[in-house]
Structures are given as C-alpha cells and as structure tokens.
Amino acid sequence: KIDPRAKNPDSLKWVYKYNYIKNHYWDNFNFARAGLIRTPVFQEKLNTYFKNMILQMPDSLIGPMIQLIEKAKKNTEVNHYIFLYLLNESNQSQIMGMDKDFVLLSEKYVLQDPKTWLDTAVVSKIRERVNAIKPNLIGNIAPELKLQDSEGNYYSLRQMNAKFTLLYFWEPDCSHCQKTTPILYKDLYQVLKSKGIEIYAVLTQNNKEKWMKAIQEYNIQAWTNVWDPNYSSNFRKLYDVTSTPIIYILDKNKRIVAKRLDVDSSLKFLQAQPEMK
C-alpha cells in the first residue's frame, strides 16, 4: 500500500506496479507445454522480460536467469530451449560484464554436470570459451604480465603505480589501432595523466622496427611500451586477445573494473570515478 503522505506517490505507484509485474511475469505460463516454445509469442515474452523488465546489468540478470531455468525443469524441451537462449544472450551481449553470466551459466548447467545433455563438441566449445574469458572477468585481479621494453628492461603490470592503469593491446599494422592509438593519447591520456592515469601498452606482434617507428609517430614514449618477442607470457590466452585494439581498465589494486571499451567510453568511465574528481 502506498503511503498517501509520500512526497511523490505517483513514482512510488509506478515502482510498485513495475515490481509486481516483474515478480509475477511468469505466473500463468505453463512450462510443461513444450509446444509454446515453437511460437513467436514465447520468444517475444523472453525478450521482453530479459531486455525490458530486468535492469540491464550482469548482477541483476543472473538471478532471474537461474530462476527461470529452474522453473522450466517441468519440461525438458522447454528447459533446454530457455537455457540455450540465455547462454547465447549472455555470450553475445554488448553489455559490459555479461561474460561473467555466461561463465556462471556454463559452469552450473554444463561443465559441472556429468550428465549434461549437450553434444560433446558443443561442451568442448563452451569449455574453451569459459577458459578464455574466466581469467579476465571484471572484478578479477588482472593476470600478471612482466614484459620487456625495446631495450630489454622488464616491467610488471601489477607494479604500475597509478590510480588507474589502461592495459592496451595493439599493433602498428592494425587499421583500427592506427585510428585508436593517437586518439587514446590525445583525448584520454593527455587529459587524465595529471590525475593518475598510466598506460601499459602491449605490442601483440613481434616486428620491433615497425613498433619503434609507431611509438615515435604517435608520440607515446611516456607510456610503458612493452612486447613479448618470444610469446612466452601467454598474454593472448590470459586476456582473450584475438583482435586489436583492446582496452582493459585496472584500478590501483590492479583489479579489472572495465574492459573492451572504446576510447570515448573509457574516458567517460574514468571521469565518473570518485578517484578522478
């Protein structure tokens, strides 16, 4: 019941109505009827619930995901459909951090289930994907990298002394890197360096000559520019580096707080942090 003395009763009514609809959204759905999953109505119902009713944040979505999968156990076909829908959505989502939900769903319902119903090849692909992203999930301490500069001096990622460290994977021949690197330097590093931002820039290839030329061209000598000429650090696997450029943002404790953002989004993210005020 809404207190009539509330300062904004209309807003409270809206919140109450929203929570009621969200909490009772599946009350009259018969999970035992497998035929429903072959109708466009069911797909639309799933989309509406998970994309409009639930706050679009990984921690807000995972609970309702698991609840719905459990409810759907009344019918194997319905259960499998919903699980695959949610697994694919979490894997393909553009929401930062949804890979965490993909890992949680994969481990709970596939990798930790000795009687999984999925094909062996599918399970193998899921395991491979989990192994690729689990080390670099948001909230994790960033896997250590100790890489060398052009003169052979080694620099530790975890020993970077900064409020925030941008871990930047790039290569001189990458067309996107050629656009991103100067923007990263001018629009982010130059703007925030006085507030405690450092960049640990990792060359992903092994052409030293092109690398040195690019460092000079982009005027990024102030960055910690490192490479792994023998590919001995396993950085590609640790950080799921399959393309470039890639940006990870680490806090002062080297915990991953954001990942795979463009320069503009990285700048906005950092400027919103209390430490940068």
What spans do the regions from the language model cover?
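Short active-site neighborhood of thiol/selenol oxidoreductases, capturing the structured segment around
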Residues: 153-185, 198-200
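Oxidative protein folding and maturation machinery
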Residues: 1-146, 150
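Structural microenvironment flanking redox-active thiols in thiol-disulfide oxidoreductases
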Residues: 178-216, 232-235
